[in-house]
Amino acid sequence: MDSDASLVSSRPSSPEPDDLFLPARSKGSSGSAFTGGTVSSSTPSDCPPELSAELRGAMGSAGAHPGDKLGGSGFKSSSSSTSSSTSSAAASSTKKDKKQMTEPELQQLRLKINSRERKRMHDLNIAMDGLREVMPYAHGPSVRKLSKIATLLLARNYILMLTNSLEEMKRLVSEIYGGHHAGFHPSACGGLAHSAPLPAATAHPAAAAHAAHHPAVHHPILPPAAAAAAAAAAAAAVSSASLPGSGLPSVGSIRPPHGLLKSPSAAAAAPLGGGGGGSGASGGFQHWGGMPCPCSMCQVPPPHHHVSAMGAGSLPRLTSDAK
């Protein structure tokens, strides 16, 4: 009885919120499946109308978004289903081909594949063993056999080290035999201008011959003036010690001009120096100190050239001196 009285006493306070939410309920019931106006919820009666409107808007938007998500996922699922159907069709065709093959044919195919793989691995092991034999560590004390990857890495390091050593050796050889040789032999002895005999040495044929055989040596340490003075002193000593009545012509007139003289000044200076009336050329060849010159101009000609090139007037004199 007390509960019934409380319900009756509390009933007059409820119509006010019901009257407030009546338009909203009628609007919501028009789009829903429930058409009765007596169906009500206790939640709208407890909440203000503004909050309930926001909740309804949020629920409507949430209802729209899941539809979109479902639509996108539906497209993805359709594409994935297409690809899976293609792969399944290919697998089924392969299975059909294998099913069409008999059991002996399948066994033969498996044996062929296994033999091919076995041969490939056998060749690889032989190649790796050959590589291990030529590695430097193979000739040392007995060590554990390296794996394939370790052997390949070690071989790579050795190849890089040997390449660097070879490049360094080439550079050193080019500096030793290339740079200095090119500095002392300009244009590979093609345009060399060996110094002609000095004017003081052209007074006597023997001095001219000595000057032609031994041109002025330009020592890399001595200055050019000292080298010229030393050459003049050597020519004077030879002229004082030579026979005064010698009828032999000068070696400069005997030897033909060098064929490697390509520059006009050097080619013109060679015949003038050989005749005994020319002036000395200034640009001489820088020889190595204490070492013979490798070019053919500084080499002593063989004796048969002297005999064949001698004049006809000097031969009777030689025979008379011999008698």
Curated annotation (Swiss-Prot):
CDD domains for this protein: bHLH_TS_OLIG2
Keywords from the named record: Chromosomal rearrangement, Cytoplasm, Developmental protein, DNA-binding, Nucleus, Proto-oncogene, Transcription, Transcription regulation
Amino acid composition bias (Low complexity), ranges on this chain: 76-93
Annotated Gene Ontology cellular component terms: chromatin; cytoplasm; nucleus
Residues of the signal peptide: none
Residue span of region Disordered: 1-107
Alphabetical list of InterPro entries matching this protein: bHLH_dom, bHLH_transcription_factors, HLH_DNA-bd_sf, Olig2_bHLH
GO molecular function: DNA-binding transcription factor activity, RNA polymerase II-specific; E-box binding; HMG box domain binding; identical protein binding; protein dimerization activity; sequence-specific double-stranded DNA binding
Domains: entry comment: The bHLH is essential for interaction with NKX2-2.
Name of the protein: Oligodendrocyte transcription factor 2
Organism listed in the record: Homo sapiens (Human)
